[in-house]
Amino acid sequence: MSLALGHGTIAGSTAAPLSEEGEVTSGLQALAVEDTGGPSVSASKAEEEGKGSQEEAGREGSRPEEALEAPSAASDERAEGEAEDWCVPCSDEEVELPANGQSWMPPPSEIQRLYELLATQGTLELQAEILPRRPPTPEAQSEEERSDEEPEAKEEEEEKPHMPTEFDFDDEPMTPKDSLIDRRRTPGSSARSQKREARLDKVLSDMKRHKKLEEQILRTGRDLFSLDSEGPSPTSPPLRSSGNSLFPRQRKY
């Protein structure tokens, strides 16, 4: 029993350091794993970033390809639509084919004759019925031209004098015009009115006459040509000129 216990104690004492060594080794291994894991993680991150950049570059490269494919597809659709709408119209000969389906051809003898004429004369006479030409159709007038012509026509109508006809009746009495009245003229007088002319001798004579009248007024205090036609009464005092004005009252010639 003692041996067993002793052995057990030895084993227990030896087991304790072994367990401590195991812990140390496991800790070292963990540290080693952590040390080795650092670069591996950075490498994995770098790989992921490289893959992301490659994917972005691939997307950017695919965008112009898609942009090029889109107009090409649109052009293909347009070409298909034009191909469906495109057609060649038939010629007059194809439309006006005879019942048997063969186009008209001159006989060989006529072709030979025409070639011989070309060889000898050089030209062929044109045998065709010349139809008369019709006059050109008048162009439709625009609204502006019509509006310009209308006022001109109205002005012409207004300018035309009214011509009297046998169907014109004047129901209202007309007042006689002065020109229609027979004026009595003195014998020897002309129908035309005399034109007044200004002469120097007449002007000078008028000035002398007015000067004499003014002297008469200043001397007598009375105007020869009074306003009222009646003569002056003997009881009325003579008019005297005031100092402010030469003429006491206006003369009437």
From Swiss-Prot:
InterPro entries: PA1. The keyword Phosphoprotein applies. Keywords: DNA damage, DNA recombination, DNA repair, Nucleus, Phosphoprotein, Transcription, Transcription regulation. Its main location: nucleus. The modification Phosphothreonine is found at residue 137. It is found in: Nucleus. Residues 141-158 have a biased composition (Acidic residues). It holds the Pfam family PAXIP1_C. Residues 160-253 are annotated as: Sufficient for interaction with ESR1. Residues 1-108, 126-253 are annotated as: Disordered. Disruption phenotype: Normal germ layer specification and developmental patterning but limited anterior development and arrest by 8.5 dpc, likely due at least in part to defects in extraembryonic tissue. Residues 238-247 have a biased composition (Polar residues). Residues 115-159 are annotated as: Sufficient for interaction with NCOA1. One of its GO terms (biological process) is DNA repair. Component of the KMT2 family MLL2/MLL3 complex, at least composed of the histone methyltransferases KMT2D and/or KMT2C, the common subunits ASH2L, RBBP5, WDR5 and DPY30, and the complex type-specific subunits PAXIP1/PTIP, PAGR1, NCOA6 and KDM6A; PAXIP1 is required for the association with the MLL2/MLL3 complex. Forms a constitutive complex with PAXIP1/PTIP independently of the MLL2/MLL3 complex. Interacts with NCOA1, ESR1, NR3C1, AR. This is PAXIP1-associated glutamate-rich protein 1A. It comes from Mus musculus. The lineage of its organism: Eukaryota, Metazoa, Chordata, Craniata, Vertebrata.
